[in-house]
């Protein structure tokens, strides 16, 4: 059950971490959901498997959507949800040692919007002391680097107009109805897939023109591990009604779909992720890269967006009904490959990761590989 009572975090640690004298590395998870859904405490995001590897785990929940990310004249500033995340990280710095964690070894990791949040925290003003490493899984950097300001202004003006029509306080349900209207309005804009989210050029974030410089500065302070799934764009290509109408054409429909998934995957995710990795290395920073390229036999989504998450968080019970895992082999692969992926993520958090580039697949054997 999700609701707007969302300003909290959860700490997961072993008894040994809580009672032993040695402080453990900390991993902080930021969830995805396009900044409109999700929460750190969902069962599917349980970090027990990682905590069992000698880590103290923290899951953050924060304001989303209209409540957290839309600047509205005279009513709400931008980036409130980002400030929620910053406050949570400040709490971790001040308190995690009492729970067995080392505040000087904090690794952020997140997927999709969560990865985008981490990218924003990397370039935000005055946040670099709050964490030391970052894992960006499927960050939508192609959308992030679009100029979203025109859309933000239009949505903010519409929200202001709707709210100004009455002086009566609005219920959360009424605000969520307004949010749905704003999401529909956002579809008119090129960056409408991220209608809400941190806004560049609004405190504490730099304008778009300064992002490259901020990344160079971050490279001197924060170790990076970035990656993507091979077919990130599969669900997003299907969201476009016009495109989807071509996918059922006889003989060529499947080819059109494959081509569109290839294009969307690269424009929204892969090109931006690879560019960030390369820019980091050129700036003298430490960056590692992975590609997740497994999918179950009965899933036409193939190696889709979010598919790596069940291998890191939650249990088979939490993920069994997910369409992206349809296939008789999924449970066995989830348990075997998931063990290796958790080991890899934990090794990065501990500063013990040796691989530079990792292909995560089911049965192929090329490059530096986990299978």
How would you name each of these model-derived features?
Residues 1-163, 215-222, 226-236, 352-353:
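Serine-hydrolase-like catalytic core of hydrolytic proteins
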Residues 45-46, 117, 211-212, 275-276, ...:
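Short, hydrophobic/aromatic alpha-helical segments in well-folded domains
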Residues 128, 133, 137-243, 260-264, ...:
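Substrate-access "cap/lid" subdomains that shape
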Residues 234, 278-371:
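Mobile gating loops/cap/lid regions near enzyme active sites that modulate substrate access
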Residues 238-251, 362-365:
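Short Gly/aromatic-enriched secondary-structure transition segments
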Residues 1, 68-73, 251-259, 320-330:
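Short glycine/proline-rich turn/loop motifs
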Residues 79-83, 267, 332-339:
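A generic "alpha-helical surface" signal
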Residues 85-93, 269-277, 342-349:
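Short, hydrophobic/amphipathic alpha-helical packing segments
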């Amino acid at each position: 059950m999700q609701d707007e009572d969302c300003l909290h975090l959860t700490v997961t640690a072993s008894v040994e971490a809580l009672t032993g004298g040695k402080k453990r590395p900390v991993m902080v998870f930021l969830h995805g959901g396009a900044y409109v859904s999700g929460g750190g405490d969902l069962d599917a995001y349980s970090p027990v498997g990682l905590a069992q590897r000698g880590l103290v785990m923290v899951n953050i929940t924060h304001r989303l959507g209209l409540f957290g990310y839309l600047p509205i004249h005279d009513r709400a500033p931008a980036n409130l949800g980002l400030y929620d995340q910053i406050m949570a990280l400040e709490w971790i710095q001040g308190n995690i040692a009492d729970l067995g964690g080392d505040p000087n070894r904090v690794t952020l990791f997140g997927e999709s919007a969560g990865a985008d949040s981490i990218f924003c925290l990397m370039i935000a003003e005055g946040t670099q002391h709050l964490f030391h490493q970052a894992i960006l899984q499927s960050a939508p950097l192609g959308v992030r680097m679009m100029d979203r300001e025109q859309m933000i202004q239009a949505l903010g003006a519409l929200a202001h107009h709707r709210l100004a029509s009455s002086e009566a306080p609005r219920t959360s349900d009424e605000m969520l109805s307004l949010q749905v209207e704003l999401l529909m309005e956002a579809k008119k804009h090129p960056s409408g897939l991220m209608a809400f989210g941190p806004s560049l050029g609004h405190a504490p974030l730099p304008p778009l023109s300064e992002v490259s410089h901020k990344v160079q500065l971050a490279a001197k302070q924060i170790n990076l591990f970035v990656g993507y799934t091979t077919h990130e764009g599969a669900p997003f290509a299907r969201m476009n009604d016009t495109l989807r109408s071509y996918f059922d054409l006889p003989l060529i429909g499947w080819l059109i779909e494959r081509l569109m998934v290839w294009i969307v995957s690269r424009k929204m995710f892969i090109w931006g992720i690879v560019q960030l990795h390369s820019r980091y290395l050129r700036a003298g920073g430490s960056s590692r890269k992975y590609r997740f390229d497994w999918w179950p036999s009965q899933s036409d989504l193939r190696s889709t967006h979010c598919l790596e998450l069940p291998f890191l968080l939650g249990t088979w019970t939490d993920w069994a009904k997910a369409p992206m895992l349809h296939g008789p082999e999924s449970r066995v692969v989830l348990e075997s490959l998931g063990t290796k992926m958790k080991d890899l993520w934990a090794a990065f958090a501990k500063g013990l990761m040796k691989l530079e580039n990792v292909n995560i697949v089911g049965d192929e054997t090329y490059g530096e590989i986990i299978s």
